């Protein structure tokens, strides 16, 4: 297989995947209606712009003209696609859910409890059959039970799975899930300026990914104890709230420190991180443009470089598609002990260089490929089989002497 072809094909394949704004993404009220008030961690993923919208592109990836040029790569990709489709079909046959069409978003809430598995509630939005909870718990030896006329499924280990009156699927510890399945459930109001209010502000911007940490004092201490003395340990121990989010046009983060002095350090670190993000766009562009400019000088020296020369326009196009010019907008503000960072471009790849890894590999191939003369290793000396012992032939007996001729008689 030509080394350059699969690398170029996969880099170009990345340009086929996109993340677009989802105007129908859950609002903060919808995402947090079943929130666990004392949760230490919150995770939210909008599956529509990430998985559902891009799955058809994944299905057609092996038919991409550039990938089809490499039979081995295309065959390997089709094998993976077949396995993925097999898993998708198996899940659909077992529980009646198409993982790439029926799920729209999910939100998870976790509450730490020492070194054990945290208590949690997972909230899944989508299209679900009324008997889904029962079908999910049956293989685990679970039993059905009814909550406000809807069938839920209880597992032997204390988990409960059920559908709410609005059709949302909940799963988690029984004491957390059962009250949320009831028709009478109402979320607690969010106090102005609280951690939940900050999380809601981020969710109302309709990001496709959110990770928030609002640890209790005990959870923060336990987590910090697992990290050696370092800036990372201080980040854990000093935060009251941390939120990271990603949208179709950029990324952002919020950090609420225990005091303004540490918040000032976070502000400085955030400004430095943004400079690195800008450099992550410019450096790969510079490396690839330099390499492409130099390529013609090495024509005919290796098949890899010749193939790169053939596709140099596509290489530059991939650079433009997967990186930006580093000129995205960014604001870093500090108000007391709260630091807020917002970045924005025309698209996510203008801010977050999603192709930097692939382009880095490509640059390494372009700059590091050298013609190698074919070498033939000398054949190892052949082992001579030992000579078979030979039996000496007997020495022939000498022929008898002829009898003397008698003298003549006189």
Residue ranges and their predicted role:
Residues 46-48, 125-129, 166-167, 174-176, ...:
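Solvent-exposed coil/turn segments that connect beta secondary-structure elements
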Residues 155-187, 247-249, 331-350:
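A short, solvent-exposed beta-edge/loop patch
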């Amino acid at each position: 297989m030509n080394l350059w072809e699969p690398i170029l094909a996969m880099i170009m394949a990345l340009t086929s995947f996109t993340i677009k704004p989802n105007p129908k993404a859950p609002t903060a009220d919808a995402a947090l209606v079943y929130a666990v008030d004392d949760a230490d961690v919150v995770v939210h993923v909008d599956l529509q712009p990430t998985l559902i919208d891009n799955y058809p592109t994944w299905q057609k990836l092996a038919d991409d003209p550039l990938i089809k040029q490499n039979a081995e790569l295309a065959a390997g990709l089709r094998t993976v696609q077949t396995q993925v489709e097999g898993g998708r079909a198996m899940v659909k046959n077992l529980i009646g859910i198409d993982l790439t069409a029926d799920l729209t978003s999910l939100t998870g809430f976790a509450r730490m409890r020492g070194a054990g598995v945290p208590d949690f509630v997972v909230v899944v939005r989508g299209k679900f059959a009324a008997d889904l909870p029962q079908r999910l718990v049956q293989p685990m030896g679970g039993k059905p039970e009814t909550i406000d006329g809807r069938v839920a499924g209880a597992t032997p280990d204390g988990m409960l799975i059920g559908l709410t009156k609005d059709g949302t699927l909940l799963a988690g510890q029984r004491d957390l899930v059962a009250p949320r399945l009831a028709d009478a459930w109402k979320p607690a109001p969010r106090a102005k300026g609280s951690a939940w209010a900050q999380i809601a502000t981020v969710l109302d911007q309709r990001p496709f990914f959110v990770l928030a940490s609002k640890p209790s004092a005990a959870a923060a201490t336990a987590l910090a104890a697992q990290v050696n003395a370092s800036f990372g340990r201080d980040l854990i121990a000093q935060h009251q709230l941390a939120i990271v989010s990603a949208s179709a046009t950029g990324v952002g983060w919020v950090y609420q420190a225990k005091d303004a002095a540490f918040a000032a350090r976070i502000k400085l670190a955030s400004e430095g991180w943004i400079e690195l993000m800008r450099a992550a766009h410019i450096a790969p562009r510079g490396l690839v443009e330099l390499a492409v400019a130099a390529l013609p000088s090495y024509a005919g020296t290796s098949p890899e470089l010749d193939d790169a020369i053939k596709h140099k326009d596509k290489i530059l196009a991939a650079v433009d598609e997967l990186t930006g010019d580093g000129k995205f907008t960014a604001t870093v503000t500090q108000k007391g002990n709260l630091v807020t960072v917002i970045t924005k471009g025309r698209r996510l790849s203008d801010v977050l260089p999603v192709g930097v890894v692939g382009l880095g590999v490509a640059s390494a191939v372009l700059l590091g490929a050298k013609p190698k003369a074919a070498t033939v290793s000398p054949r190892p000396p052949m082992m001579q089989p030992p000579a078979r012992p030979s039996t000496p032939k007997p020495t022939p007996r000498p022929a008898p002497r002829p009898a003397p001729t008698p003298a003549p008689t006189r």
